[in-house]
């Protein structure tokens, strides 16, 4: 029960958290000291550090927009497991350049079932510690383009089962092909990705 080795925080310490707004059905990722200052129509969700479904998963079919605030670039999530899985009405994700993935180990089901997303800019994604990408882009029916940089690597990935399966609109260096849906195609030179440019400051 102290601020140095215990569970308490110093006043003014920043927290990483997510706010679901039930009026505009938006999901906003924040990193600041205002975790207790939310409106009546907003719900604060904590960010899991392991492979557990996120709190906002219960609202997945309602979410239409995701926003990462610039301050979130200072957060260091350990897992993106199920973050946007089966958000079937999600049409836009803003500020993905502010998601620092350098400490993330699991991206399983991260975008699976996002049926309305057409483009993902993952150019700043550092996947050097990721070991699990199962179903990461599974059944993204409208997804045509995924932008990445050379920081998107799969060297440590041991579970890539059905990573791209049924995302048949994908086209990068090659177009999607049935039975070709593992990490082999997670690159922009010979796979389904397109080369992009990282625009965020670490």
Per-segment meaning from a language model:
Residues 53-55, 136, 161-173:
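Small/polar residue-rich beta-strand/coil "junction" motifs that cap repeat-based extracellular fibers
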Residues 78-85:
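Non-membrane alpha-helical segments in proteins
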């Amino acid at each position: 029960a102290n601020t140095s080795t215990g569970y308490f925080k110093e006043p003014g310490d920043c927290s990483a958290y997510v706010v679901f707004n039930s009026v505009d059905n938006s999901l906003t990722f924040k990193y600041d000291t205002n975790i207790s200052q939310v409106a009546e129509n907003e719900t604060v969700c904590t960010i899991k550090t392991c492979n557990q479904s996120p709190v906002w998963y219960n609202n997945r079919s309602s979410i239409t927009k995701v926003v990462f605030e610039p301050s979130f670039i200072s957060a260091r999530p350990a897992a993106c497991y199920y973050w946007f899985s089966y958000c079937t009405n999600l049409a836009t994700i803003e500020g993905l350049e502010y998601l620092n993935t350098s400490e993330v180990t699991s991206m399983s089901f991260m975008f699976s079932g996002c049926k309305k997303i057409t483009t993902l800019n993952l150019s700043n994604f550092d996947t050097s510690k990721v070991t699990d990408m199962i179903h990461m882009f599974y059944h993204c029916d409208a997804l045509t383009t995924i932008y990445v940089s050379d920081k998107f690597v799969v060297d440590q990935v041991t579970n890539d089962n059905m990573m791209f399966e049924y995302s048949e609109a994908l086209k990068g260096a090659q177009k999607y092909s049935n039975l070709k849906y593992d990490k082999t195609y997670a690159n922009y030179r010979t796979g389904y990705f397109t080369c992009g440019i990282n625009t965020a400051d670490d």
